């Protein structure tokens, strides 16, 4: 006799097999076609699509004087913790313009002084904005490249026919648009061999010396503080050499260069070569760079963070935007280096920090604690520690709710979500077919149990994240049961043979054909359907949007287009939700979460004048790659031990995304482990501050649509 859990597993596998089989029998395509959408759903051409609204999300207002003070005295005080000269700009665009103007200034200066200027250039994705601005300056006649010599700071080896090339990329983004002489572009000779590598690298260094050395080096700070292809462990004395590329950087290269095959080795100038430049301009953008920027700027010089070895160079400038600067002391903890412009969020952050420093809960903090740790300004503003403590404690207390859709017939004055209307129409947008349960599985279950009309919209197919073994498993099972149920016809047998033969002969980096991508899509859809059924979401409320930008079959995705946005507009117009949940994981290393969020926000922008939008609240969740900082949390949904186990089970319904999932990132934990650890950590943080003790908490931040 089977145990209950065995029956459940059998049922799940059977449902998955039937869904996949039925798909190929009926040739049903669940991807909405834009040409078939009613006219009322298609955006008018007079509306300009806003495709990057997520970059305008400002969780906090940073006073300008923290990053761009009026005088050098204040700047010196702000930079007290910084060991590398850093310029912070509000936007990436502003930072790129500054780098371009600096490059033009130095090129003009050196060509005037000695007749030429020697540049060492990288072509990392962060440099593109600066080079675009530099081209604009060239077109305006403000810089001349006729006497400029350019050395490429790194190149792949060997150069594959269809593989990535730094020189090719640099031509696309800069060299083909300026008056640089072809003979003045120095790069790696593709005909060299490993046997002649050492001599060639020495000759490359000698050529730089013969040209008078590097006047200006321009490059990005990469993951974990890499510079050029100098990864963790590269010493300050490292020179031009052949290096082995790690798996993570190869994955990033594959994505940035839109290629599946990346060499395992490359030639790079060493840290010593880059430090020999008379001047250095380096850059990093976005909040996913914030942690490494803090290590580079405020940490000790350490070969484990190669960019930190630039400390001590007399003429180095690191240029970053506010996103990349958010972990620097002058931005995240300004009370340590200057007088503050206090607001509710900064006060909350300061008090949470003070609790961590003293080991006390909020309500036990004293005037002495505030004075001892440099927060005396708050005592002057509020009169006593007691007043500040009560203010922050109440704010945090009011974020906690067991009713994420609002508690009916209750006073909602101090609740994060309004009581009425009840029940609400709710749409949960999930970038991949598992992000909903990973990031807000407990909240999703609460919404269903509290009788809201919950819709789950899976924005992408997630098909490239299904391993070949997971797909073959279902074919092997269908091959066995096909004769039992009479669907072992010629069509099915031909498809099964072709698919299994393709997988056997598939090489690393080969793109799946369209049939296999559809099968993998069905696997993800079946898993999501089973998870939704487990939670209690109605079958008719499960939507597979399959946004076109994702369907390239490769890691590199297409650009967000109006077709993507119109699919979301149709769903929103059909449901007319009163509550929306959207991914806020803007630091997702694979980029899909950000694009999906941009698609939703673009749709909401186009629908901003709809009557139902006046009665709709939008909440952002995290959990797959990061968690909200407590000073930003506006709704905290507690999860009991039983609910946390239920959430784990709902995540485990996505079996293809367990141990052998292709894109787990650089975190060794499985997705359910990450989710539980983050949810428990949030609950422990609340408990440590003196609030109620919960097993876990899921956190949310409200998004205010741009009008």
Report the location of each language-model feature.
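Class I SAM-dependent methyltransferase SAM-binding "motif I" and its flanking Rossmann-like core
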Residues: 224-271
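N-terminal glycine-/serine-/threonine-rich phosphate-binding loop
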Residues: 47-118, 412-413, 420
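A conserved mid-domain beta-alpha-beta active-site/ligand-binding segment of alpha/beta enzyme cores
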Residues: 628-679
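ATP/nucleoside-binding phosphotransfer catalytic cores, i.e., glycine-rich phosphate-binding loops
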Residues: 50-60, 73, 278-374
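Glycine-rich anion-binding loop/nest that anchors nucleotide
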Residues: 218-220, 256-297, 317-321, 581-584
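Ligand-binding beta-strand-loop-alpha-helix segment within the catalytic cores
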Residues: 69-83, 143-216
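Active-site beta-strand->loop->alpha-helix modules in alpha/beta enzyme cores, enriched
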Residues: 193-194, 357-433, 437-614, 648-653, ...
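Cysteine-centered motifs
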Residues: 22-25
């Amino acid at each position: 006799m089977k145990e209950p859990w065995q029956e459940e597993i059998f049922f799940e596998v059977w449902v998955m097999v039937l869904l996949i089989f039925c798909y190929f029998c009926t040739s049903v395509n669940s991807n909405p076609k834009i040409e078939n959408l009613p006219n009322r759903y298609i955006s008018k051409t007079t509306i300009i699509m806003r495709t990057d609204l997520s970059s305008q999300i400002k969780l906090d207002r940073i006073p300008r004087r923290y990053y761009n003070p009026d005088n050098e005295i204040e700047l010196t005080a702000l930079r007290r913790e910084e060991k590398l000269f850093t310029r912070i700009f509000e936007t990436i665009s502003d930072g790129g313009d500054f780098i371009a103007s600096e490059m033009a200034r130095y090129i003009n200066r050196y060509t005037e002084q000695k007749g030429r200027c020697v540049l060492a250039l990288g072509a990392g994705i962060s440099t593109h904005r600066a080079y675009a601005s530099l081209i604009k300056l060239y077109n305006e006649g403000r810089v001349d490249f006729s006497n400029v010599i350019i050395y490429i700071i790194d190149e792949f080896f060997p150069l594959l026919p269809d593989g990535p090339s730094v020189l090719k990329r640099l031509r696309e983004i800069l060299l083909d648009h300026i008056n640089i002489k072809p003979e003045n572009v120095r790069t790696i000779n593709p005909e060299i061999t490993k046997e002649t590598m050492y001599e060639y690298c020495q000759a490359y260094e000698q050529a730089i010396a013969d040209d008078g050395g590097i006047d200006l080096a321009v490059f990005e700070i990469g993951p974990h503080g890499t510079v050029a292809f100098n990864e963790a462990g590269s010493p300050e004395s490292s020179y031009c050499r052949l290096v082995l590329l790690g798996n993570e950087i190869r994955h990033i290269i594959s994505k940035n260069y839109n290629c599946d095959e990346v060499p395992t080795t490359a030639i790079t100038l060493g840290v010593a070569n880059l430090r020999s430049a008379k001047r250095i301009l380096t850059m990093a953008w976005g909040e996913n760079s914030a942690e490494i920027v803090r290590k580079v700027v405020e940490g000790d010089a350490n070969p484990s963070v190669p960019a930190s070895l630039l400390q001590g160079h007399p003429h180095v400038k690191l240029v970053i935007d506010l996103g990349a600067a958010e972990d620097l002391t002058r931005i995240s903890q300004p009370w340590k280096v200057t007088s503050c412009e206090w607001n509710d969020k900064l006060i909350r952050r300061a008090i949470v920090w003070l609790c961590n420093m003293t080991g006390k809960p909020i309500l036990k903090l004293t005037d002495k604690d505030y004075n001892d740790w440099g927060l005396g300004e708050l005592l002057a503003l509020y009169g006593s520690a007691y007043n500040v403590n009560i203010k922050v404690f109440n704010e945090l207390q009011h974020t906690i709710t067991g009713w994420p859709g609002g508690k009916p017939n209750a006073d909602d004055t101090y609740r994060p979500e309004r009581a009425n209307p009840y029940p609400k129409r709710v749409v949960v947008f999930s970038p991949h077919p598992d992000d909903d349960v990973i990031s807000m599985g407990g909240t999703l279950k609460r919404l269903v149990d509290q009788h809201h009309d919950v819709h789950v919209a899976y924005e992408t197919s997630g098909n490239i994240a299904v391993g070949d073994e997971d797909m073959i498993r279902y074919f092997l099972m269908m091959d066995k049961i096909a004769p039992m149920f009479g669907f072992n016809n010629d069509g099915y047998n031909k498809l099964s043979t072709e698919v299994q033969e393709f997988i056997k002969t598939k090489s690393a980096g080969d793109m799946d054909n369209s049939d296999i991508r559809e099968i993998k899509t069905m696997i993800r859809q079946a898993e999501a359907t089973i998870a939704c059924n487990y939670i209690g979401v109605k079958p008719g409320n499960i939507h597979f949007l399959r946004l076109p930008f994702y369907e390239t079959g490769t890691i590199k995705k297409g650009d967000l287009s109006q077709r993507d946005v119109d699919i979301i507009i149709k769903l929103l117009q059909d449901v007319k939700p009163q509550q929306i949940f959207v991914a806020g994981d803007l630091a997702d290393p694979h980029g899909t979460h950000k694009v999906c969020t941009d698609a939703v926000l673009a749709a909401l922008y186009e629908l901003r004048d709809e009557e139902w939008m006046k009665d709709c609240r939008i909440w952002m969740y995290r959990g797959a790659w990061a968690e909200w900082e407590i000073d930003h949390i506006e709704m905290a949904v507690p999860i009991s031990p039983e609910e946390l186990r239920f959430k784990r089970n709902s995540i485990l319904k996505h079996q293809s995304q367990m141990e052998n999932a292709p894109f787990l990132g650089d975190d060794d934990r499985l997705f359910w482990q990450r989710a539980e650890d983050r949810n428990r950590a949030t609950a422990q943080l609340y408990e440590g501050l003196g609030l109620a003790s919960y097993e876990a908490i899921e956190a949310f931040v409200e998004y205010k649509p741009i009008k």
